């Protein structure tokens, strides 16, 4: 198998890099198109642009495919977060149900957590207050509700203080 990256270009207003790879093997020539989040792309050894085909070994090809999958999981996660709040646990489960491997779902959840898209502590506090004030739930009922929504025990404990 021979693989060459034939195109690397910024995409999505610089938030991603688009790559086109030509692969020749016993099946013939085929092209793969991938998008990688800029944050992940900077962690690779790939140049930001090429003037001639750039040889890609099996390890590099595997890395590109994985990072492209993680980028797709981030895009899917953003769409999910646009419509409703999700805990890390719930978002991970939804991404896996959409067909992403657990590793890519974990990577996307870490991205959202590190970049402030998921604030479980703030959401748990707000929900605990709402349940106590509006629905007049007691601590145990609030704890059960928060746990049912996927909040971790430590986050629940802090929200109830």
Give the label of every model feature segment.
Residues 1-161:
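An alpha-helical, amphipathic repeat domain used for nucleic-acid recognition
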